[in-house]
A protein has these predicted regions:
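Active-site neighborhoods and metal-handling regions in enzymes and metal-associated proteins
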Residues: 1-264
């Protein structure tokens, strides 16, 4: 209720455009009077689920035979079929792009959340960098990162956070018994989660050990330069695809075999 109230205060006049509807769950929340016996508890004969609430809202608003927007990009097939069976006369329209746009525009408190998460992640990576040397195991690096993040008391390390070296550095894998050698590249792909605030970070970097092949140092420099170019080019209004190409095409000029799904 507090979060809803704060959100409405931020929205101001636009707050009337959304309504929060409660529904039943298996969690039996009771008032103090009910617990002490001062008030009578009336048990429901049946639970009203979120889908029950949805059906009621659609029918009360006379929408069961009209056009309904759904987020098809993330809706699972059984749930969508349930919608079709419940509202056979409705026309379902994919509005996934509208949700993407809504999520891409961050409020000030969300921006601050990401800044805090990134700072905590960076501190964790820094602590790991202090111990990266030949003889250190993958699991030791992972433990160092996790301990640093948990010590903040603000968030938790992502369960998929990985630190790998040698042959394992070329694939996505959980930390195992790999030991850093002076010719290795040490890779990390890790992040932190804000738990029930549902925000997360995802960062990947690599450390090149001192006796690694010279070409690996040149590749590392090119990747770093591409990243710096991308950061320098970032500005409001610039399409993300253009920002991506700034780094991607710079690296690909020198390394035609380069492939990357995202740069961040």
């Amino acid at each position: 209720e507090k979060r809803v109230r704060e959100q409405k205060e931020r929205l101001g006049e636009e707050a009337s455009e959304f309504v929060v509807r409660p529904y039943d769950t298996w969690v039996g929340v009771k008032t103090w009077d009910e617990i002490t016996g001062a008030a009578k508890t009336v048990d429901k004969q049946s639970m009203e689920s979120s889908f029950d609430m949805l059906k009621k809202m659609v029918r009360d608003m006379d929408l069961a035979h009209k056009k309904l927007g759904v987020e098809l990009a993330y809706l699972n097939v059984p749930y969508f079929r349930q919608l079709q069976e419940t509202f056979p006369e409705a026309e379902f329209v994919d509005i996934s792009s509208m949700f993407v746009l809504a999520r891409s525009v961050k409020a000030e408190d969300e921006i601050q959340m990401f800044r805090t998460l990134c700072r905590i992640a960076d501190e964790g990576f820094y602590q790991v960098s202090r111990m990266v040397r030949p003889g250190v195991r993958e699991r030791e690096m992972a433990d160092c990162f996790r301990q640093s993040v948990i010590a903040t008391g603000f968030c938790v390390p992502s369960s998929w956070s990985m630190f790998s070296t040698g042959p394992s550095g070329a694939r996505l894998t959980l930390p195992e018994d790999g030991i850093i050698e002076s010719t290795h590249v040490v890779k990390y792909d890790a992040g932190v989660n804000a738990e029930f605030d549902f925000y997360t970070t995802d960062t990947s970097r690599a450390w090149v050990m001192k006796d690694a092949a010279p070409e690996l140092f040149r590749l590392k420099d090119r990747l770093y330069e591409g990243q710096r170019r991308m950061i320098a080019a970032a500005r409001p209004g610039l399409p993300v695809c253009e920002l991506f190409r700034t780094a991607y095409e710079y690296v690909k000029e020198q390394y035609p075999c380069y492939r990357r799904g995202h740069c961040g």
